């Protein structure tokens, strides 16, 4: 009887250790995935700030892309980037 109880307790201890290991691994993967997503967001934000695209709001600190020009268009109450009738060179 003592051997059976000892075996059950030992099995529960092994399962607890394995469960803790899987949980730690899952948490590490989750943190790594979250970090990767934040890196991708930061890269896309930096890319988006280089210039404003067609119909994007523009100011002195937010310039339009090379083939666009910043203009005031009524009834919109702010400046937008519109096409300057040129084509970007590739």
Curated annotation (Swiss-Prot):
Q: Signal peptide: which range, if any?
A: 1-19
Propeptide boundaries: 20-50
Record's InterPro entries?
A: Huwentoxin-1
Kindly indicate whether the keyword Disulfide bond belongs to this entry.
Answer: yes
- Give compartment(s): Secreted
Q: In this UniProt entry, which cysteines form S-S bonds?
A: 51-65, 58-70, 64-81
Q: What is known of its domains?
A: The presence of a 'disulfide through disulfide knot' structurally defines this protein as a knottin.
Domain of life (superkingdom) = Eukaryota
Family assignment from sequence similarity:
Belongs to the neurotoxin 10 (Hwtx-1) family. 13 (Hntx-13) subfamily.
* Gene Ontology CC, one term: extracellular region
Q: What role does it play?
A: Ion channel inhibitor.
Q: Which GO terms describe its molecular function?
A: ion channel inhibitor activity; toxin activity
Q: Which UniProt keywords apply?
A: Disulfide bond, Ion channel impairing toxin, Knottin, Secreted, Signal, Toxin
Q: Does the keyword Hydrolase apply?
A: no
The protein's name: U7-theraphotoxin-Hhn1a 6
Task: Please provide an example of a Pfam family that matches this protein in its UniProt record.
Answer: Toxin_12
Tissue distribution is:
Expressed by the venom gland.
């Amino acid at each position: 009887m003592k051997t059976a109880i000892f075996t059950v307790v030992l099995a529960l201890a092994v399962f607890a250790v394995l469960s803790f290991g899987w949980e730690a691994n899952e948490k590490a993967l989750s943190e790594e995935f979250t970090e990767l997503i934040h890196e991708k967001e930061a890269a896309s934000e930096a890319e988006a700030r280089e210039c404003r695209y067609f119909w994007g709001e523009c100011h002195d600190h937010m310039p339009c892309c090379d083939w666009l020009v910043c203009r005031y268009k009524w009834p919109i109450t702010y400046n937008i980037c519109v096409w300057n009738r040129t084509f970007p060179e590739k």
